[in-house]
């Protein structure tokens, strides 16, 4: 499936395969929002104001004493973070696990046949990567991350303790977990 930016449909440089890599420029420019809106009319995207409010609320809940912030990556953020980070560490979060519980009408599915992708859901544990963002760049980098992860509001950003390979907590990071009350949350039975 290919999406084209509706503001310039004849420009081949504006075309992106939905399975193609996300870039900082694509996120910063708002082109991703426009392409998704064009491909899936009626899919509710979060407004810039809603994303900014969500980011402010998340930062207001930041655990004290932190210089900068960690972000927990468990999927594509591991190999294509699109954000500048000062440090990268293997990390585990307790109380959350990867689950095919996020319905998507793009990328892995269509509006007629939505696909399922992984999201963090309650219970168990999850191994991934922690990315440390430095304080001077925190606002810009998290704004970019919110444009990516909070596109539809399917996630809730939560602060989670990050554990190293020995099980010791080395900080708290933002993890994007499925919103169980959201319309994109799907819980399949064992048979499915």
Residue spans for each PLM region:
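A glycine-rich, hydrophobic/aromatic-adjacent loop/helix-cap motif
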Residues: 2-192
């Amino acid at each position: 499936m290919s999406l084209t930016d509706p503001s310039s449909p004849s420009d081949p440089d504006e075309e992106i395969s939905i399975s193609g890599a996300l870039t900082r420029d694509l996120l910063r420019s708002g082109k991703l929002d426009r392409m998704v809106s064009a491909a899936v009319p009626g899919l509710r995207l979060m407004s810039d104001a809603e994303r900014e409010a969500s980011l402010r609320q998340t930062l207001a809940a930041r655990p004290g004493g932190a210089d900068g912030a960690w972000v927990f990556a468990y999927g594509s953020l591991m190999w294509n973070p699109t954000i500048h980070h000062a440090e990268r560490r293997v990390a585990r979060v307790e109380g959350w696990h990867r689950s095919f519980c996020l319905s998507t009408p793009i990328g892995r599915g269509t509006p007629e046949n939505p696909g399922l992708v992984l999201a963090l859901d309650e219970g168990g544990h999850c191994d991934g990567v922690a990315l440390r963002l430095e304080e001077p760049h925190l606002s810009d980098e998290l704004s970019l991350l919110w444009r990516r992860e909070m596109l539809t509001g399917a996630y809730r950003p939560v602060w989670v303790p990050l554990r190293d390979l020995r099980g010791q907590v080395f900080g708290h990071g933002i993890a994007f977990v499925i919103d169980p009350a959201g319309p994109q949350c799907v819980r399949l039975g064992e048979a499915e």
